[in-house]
């Protein structure tokens, strides 16, 4: 009985592997628009697709980032300045993309731009601390998608949205996890709606990788800022030891993160170039073998694990 079951599982995986290896034809004629290309996943993906001969339209936040990217790629790659929090910037970038793709449409949209913002207890936050992250990671992503999706539909192309394993498990307070849960929900509804037009939507859920999002200096500085802005009553409840423990954890975060960003960009590339892309990609061994399985556990077990492994407030019961 068990041997038959194992054989069926093995056969299924072989068939899936064979099916997923089939590549889309005429990649050199396909346009891909990527946000957040100054550094990290977006920067590496832009260079990766450029090497494959695709027509990369890379959106950067700064001119410096755009210049550095152009210096490392072929003349095929083009850059545009885009701030996903500003409607006028999105409108201008969309028009720029439309002028380049013409009647062929846009084969791929990769929503990669994102920030970590302030991470910490929700009680320490104000509305702006959370809204500033949602503006980039969620609302900006949605507006870019709504603006460019007619071009993607014309090409019967792909939308690739970068979520996170933090869209499956809420590790901490603040806007980051909220935004990534939102990316998951928006992508699920978008995938079903666009399936009628031959458009495929994929979600990439990276684990912990060494990028600007996991920069320990930035995260600990933002955490200290939260501590300084909260009331004396709240500081008394949490205590200095809690602050020190959390700062130590954040300062060492990037050292514990995976440096091989290609584990993520390979998933993005597959979603754009495979005839049969996956709906979801878990990128990184921590995501595949720890955080994703953990997300399927009963809630009380997940809560208990976080309770026993997280810093404790001074006035905790």
Swiss-Prot record:
The chain crosses the membrane at residues 289-308. GO terms for cellular component: endoplasmic reticulum membrane; intracellular membrane-bounded organelle; organelle membrane. Keywords: Endoplasmic reticulum, Lipid metabolism, Membrane, Microsome, NAD, Oxidoreductase, Steroid metabolism, Transmembrane, Transmembrane helix. Not N-glycosylated. NAD(+) binds at residues 33-57. Pathway: Cofactor metabolism; retinol metabolism. InterPro entries: NAD(P)-bd_dom_sf (IPR036291), Sc_DH/Rdtase_CS (IPR020904), SDR_fam (IPR002347). Its EC number is 1.1.1.105, 1.1.1.209, 1.1.1.315, 1.1.1.53. GO terms for biological process: positive regulation of retinoic acid biosynthetic process; retinoic acid metabolic process; retinol metabolic process; steroid metabolic process. This is Retinol dehydrogenase 16. It comes from Rattus norvegicus.
């Amino acid at each position: 009985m068990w041997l038959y079951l194992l054989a069926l599982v093995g056969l299924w995986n072989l068939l899936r592997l064979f099916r997923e290896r089939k590549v889309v034809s005429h990649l050199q004629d396909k346009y891909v628009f990527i946000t957040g290309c100054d550094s990290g996943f977006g920067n590496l993906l832009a260079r990766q697709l450029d090497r494959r001969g695709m027509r990369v339209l890379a959106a950067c936040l700064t001119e410096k980032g755009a210049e550095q990217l152009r210096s490392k790629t072929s003349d095929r790659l083009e850059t545009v300045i885009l701030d996903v929090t500003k409607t006028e910037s999105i409108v201008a970038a969309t028009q720029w993309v439309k002028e380049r793709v013409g009647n062929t449409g846009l084969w791929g949209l990769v929503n990669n731009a994102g920030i970590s913002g302030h991470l910490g207890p929700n009680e320490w936050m104000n509305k702006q601390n959370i809204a500033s992250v949602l503006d980039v990671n969620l609302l900006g992503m949605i507006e870019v998608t709504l603006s460019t999706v007619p071009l993607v539909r014309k090409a019967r192309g792909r939308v690739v949205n970068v979520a996170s394993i933090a869209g499956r498990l809420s590790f901490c307070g603040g806007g980051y996890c909220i935004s990534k849960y939102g990316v998951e929900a928006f992508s699920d509804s978008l995938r079903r709606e666009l399936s009628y037009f031959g458009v495929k939507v994929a979600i990439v859920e990276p684990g912990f990788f060494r990028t600007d999002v996991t920069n320990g200096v930035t995260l600990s500085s933002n955490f200290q800022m939260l501590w300084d802005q909260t009331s004396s009553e709240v500081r008394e409840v949490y205590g200095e030891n809690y602050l020190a423990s959390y700062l130590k954890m954040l300062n060492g975060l990037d050292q514990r993160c995976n440096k091989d960003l290609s584990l993520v960009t390979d998933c993005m590339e597959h979603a754009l170039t495979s005839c049969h892309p996956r709906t979801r990609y878990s990128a990184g061994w921590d995501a595949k073998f720890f955080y994703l399985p953990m997300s399927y556990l009963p809630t009380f077990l997940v809560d208990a694990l976080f309770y026993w492994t997280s810093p404790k407030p001074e006035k905790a019961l």
